[in-house]
Amino acid sequence: MKAVYPGSFDPITLGHVDIIKRALSIFDELVVLVTENPRKKCMFTLEERKKLIEEVLSDLDGVKVDVHHGLLVDYLKKHGIKVLVRGLRAVTDYEYELQMALANKKLYSDLETVFLIASEKFSFISSSLVKEVALYGGDVTEWVPPEVARALNEKLKEGKR
């Protein structure tokens, strides 16, 4: 069975990678779908994020990385995918994700959303936190894959925030 794990992944963190690996133990195929979020100001372009994720996940079988503009359910319907994977870190994540799952189900009745609880050691990590700490010169190497740490350093040297 195929599932999609969508997100802005700006940038991908070790928490995301953990969810991806755990989802792969449940599903035969997983599409990591890089999406736009108009409410977020992204440091990396969609294509940069896609490339970074492909580098980070290159040793995993059963993973495809794709990019999508627009409604998530449109992508799912187009590709015949009926399962959505989401990670939950805290109660605040649950409230938002429940609302999104119900809205997506209304738009695509065949869709099921599977929630994976974040592993405790990654439960505090978010892409926003990673960017903020990196911006102020903090060490984020325990929160992101090495490829991402390098890309963050390069972006910050360019002055892109």
Curated annotation (Swiss-Prot):
<feature type="binding site" description="in other chain">
    <location>
        <position position="86"/>
    </location>
    <ligand>
        <name>substrate</name>
    </ligand>
</feature>
<comment type="pathway">
    <text>Cofactor biosynthesis; coenzyme A biosynthesis; CoA from (R)-pantothenate: step 4/5.</text>
</comment>
<dbReference type="GO" id="GO:0004595">
    <property type="term" value="F:pantetheine-phosphate adenylyltransferase activity"/>
</dbReference>
<feature type="binding site">
    <location>
        <position position="97"/>
    </location>
    <ligand>
        <name>ATP</name>
    </ligand>
</feature>
<feature type="binding site" description="in other chain">
    <location>
        <begin position="36"/>
        <end position="40"/>
    </location>
    <ligand>
        <name>substrate</name>
    </ligand>
</feature>
<dbReference type="GO" id="GO:0015937">
    <property type="term" value="P:coenzyme A biosynthetic process"/>
</dbReference>
<feature type="site" description="Transition state stabilizer">
    <location>
        <position position="16"/>
    </location>
</feature>
<dbReference type="GO" id="GO:0005737">
    <property type="term" value="C:cytoplasm"/>
</dbReference>
<dbReference type="InterPro" id="IPR001980">
    <property type="entry name" value="PPAT"/>
</dbReference>
<dbReference type="GO" id="GO:0005524">
    <property type="term" value="F:ATP binding"/>
</dbReference>
<feature type="binding site" description="in other chain">
    <location>
        <position position="8"/>
    </location>
    <ligand>
        <name>substrate</name>
    </ligand>
</feature>
<protein>
    <recommendedName>
        <fullName>Phosphopantetheine adenylyltransferase</fullName>
        <ecNumber>2.7.7.3</ecNumber>
    </recommendedName>
</protein>
<feature type="binding site">
    <location>
        <begin position="8"/>
        <end position="9"/>
    </location>
    <ligand>
        <name>ATP</name>
    </ligand>
</feature>
<keyword id="KW-0173">Coenzyme A biosynthesis</keyword>
<comment type="similarity">
    <text>Belongs to the bacterial CoaD family.</text>
</comment>
<feature type="binding site">
    <location>
        <begin position="122"/>
        <end position="128"/>
    </location>
    <ligand>
        <name>ATP</name>
    </ligand>
</feature>
<feature type="binding site">
    <location>
        <position position="16"/>
    </location>
    <ligand>
        <name>ATP</name>
    </ligand>
</feature>
<comment type="function">
    <text>Reversibly transfers an adenylyl group from ATP to 4'-phosphopantetheine, yielding dephospho-CoA (dPCoA) and pyrophosphate.</text>
</comment>
<comment type="subunit">
    <text>Homohexamer.</text>
</comment>
<keyword id="KW-0067">ATP-binding</keyword>
<feature type="binding site" description="in other chain">
    <location>
        <position position="72"/>
    </location>
    <ligand>
        <name>substrate</name>
    </ligand>
</feature>
<dbReference type="InterPro" id="IPR014729">
    <property type="entry name" value="Rossmann-like_a/b/a_fold"/>
</dbReference>
<keyword id="KW-0548">Nucleotidyltransferase</keyword>
<keyword id="KW-0460">Magnesium</keyword>
<feature type="binding site">
    <location>
        <begin position="87"/>
        <end position="89"/>
    </location>
    <ligand>
        <name>ATP</name>
    </ligand>
</feature>
<keyword id="KW-0963">Cytoplasm</keyword>
<keyword id="KW-0808">Transferase</keyword>
<keyword id="KW-0547">Nucleotide-binding</keyword>
<dbReference type="InterPro" id="IPR004821">
    <property type="entry name" value="Cyt_trans-like"/>
</dbReference>
<dbReference type="Pfam" id="PF01467">
    <property type="entry name" value="CTP_transf_like"/>
</dbReference>
<feature type="binding site">
    <location>
        <position position="132"/>
    </location>
    <ligand>
        <name>substrate</name>
    </ligand>
</feature>
